[in-house]
């Protein structure tokens, strides 16, 4: 299923721009609203969607995404329900790549072979599992690749030259560069160093490199887009959704628009910025 991911980046390259990768939490604030948001993202300008798997112990996530996960869990969202939402999304959109992002525990509990069968059938294109290092590739990464699912790795400012080949060895789809250290949504990246970091990674791989963590505005997205193949935005979108909720964490009449209006701003930032030449 990496074909959809490859095609998305090819379209963006043809337009001379970076891709916009948007993250939302599955089931936040409830499954039906979550599906409406998912369906609206590509129409607002998202090229690729990361769909978060709610989990009780999200160690790499900041307060915004932790709160989103709790709202989703409270609404009854689980892995089976998340795959069901993607199946419904695919009824109307067979073009936009969907990448599941989360932690290994729910997948392990579901059962890896069963999960991979169901994920493939639902129309999932790739996986980001933040707590499975390369040393544990046999657990999920290699079986996922055999099923045709991309397994996407994270690289960070602390990933040195000795570690990078291991991180990239079985990566497929794209590489996700975490532009700051720490948890999501808690700082602003050093935009000046992003292009240098991307160049360091692309010296070791031909895969697209997307950059995330700390991108909050269209201006931020435009800065990142100059030197990366894609810009990832998550916490800012989750925050926008949270601010739109009514008491009791209920979706309001403007909840979907709260997310998509920011996506349109981010898409404008990405689309207004020509990518810098390699090495610039």
Curated annotation (Swiss-Prot):
It holds the Pfam family Trp_syntA. NCBIfam families: trpA. It is an enzyme of class 4 (lyase). This is Tryptophan synthase alpha chain. The keyword Lyase applies. The alpha subunit is responsible for the aldol cleavage of indoleglycerol phosphate to indole and glyceraldehyde 3-phosphate. Tetramer of two alpha and two beta chains. It comes from the Bacteria. One of its GO terms (cellular component) is cytosol. Keywords: Amino-acid biosynthesis, Aromatic amino acid biosynthesis, Lyase, Tryptophan biosynthesis. GO terms for molecular function: tryptophan synthase activity. The keyword Membrane does not apply. Belongs to the TrpA family. Gene3D superfamilies: Aldolase class I. The gene is trpA. Its EC number is 4.2.1.20. Pathway: Amino-acid biosynthesis; L-tryptophan biosynthesis; L-tryptophan from chorismate: step 5/5. Signal peptide: none annotated.
């Amino acid at each position: 299923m990496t074909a959809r991911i490859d095609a998305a980046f090819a379209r963006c390259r043809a337009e001379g721009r970076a891709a916009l990768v948007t993250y939302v939490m599955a089931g936040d604030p409830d499954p039906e609203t979550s599906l409406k948001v998912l369906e609206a993202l590509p129409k607002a300008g998202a090229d690729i969607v990361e769909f978060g798997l709610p989990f009780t112990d999200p160690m790499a996530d900041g307060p915004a995404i932790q709160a989103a996960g709790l709202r989703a869990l409270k609404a009854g969202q689980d892995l089976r329900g998340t795959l069901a939402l993607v199946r419904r999304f695919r009824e109307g959109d067979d073009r936009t790549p969907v990448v599941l992002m989360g932690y290994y525990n729910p997948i392990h509990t579901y059962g890896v072979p069963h999960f991979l069968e169901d994920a493939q059938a639902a129309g999932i294109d790739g996986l980001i599992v933040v707590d499975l290092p390369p040393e544990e590739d046999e657990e999920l990464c290699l079986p996922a690749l055999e099923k045709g699912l991309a397994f996407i790795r994270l690289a960070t400012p602390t990933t040195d030259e000795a570690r990078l080949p291991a991180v990239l060895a079985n990566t497929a789809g794209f590489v996700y560069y975490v532009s700051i250290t720490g948890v999501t949504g808690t700082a602003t990246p050093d935009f000046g160093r992003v292009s240098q970091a991307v160049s360091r990674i692309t010296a070791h791989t031909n895969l697209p490199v997307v950059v995330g963590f700390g991108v909050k505005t269209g201006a931020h997205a435009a800065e990142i887009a100059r030197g990366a193949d894609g810009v990832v935005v998550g916490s800012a979108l989750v925050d926008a959704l949270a601010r739109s909720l009514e008491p009791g964490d209920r979706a309001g009449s403007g909840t979907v628009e709260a997310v998509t209006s920011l996506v349109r701003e981010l898409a404008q930032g990405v689309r207004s910025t020509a990518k810098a030449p390699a090495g610039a």
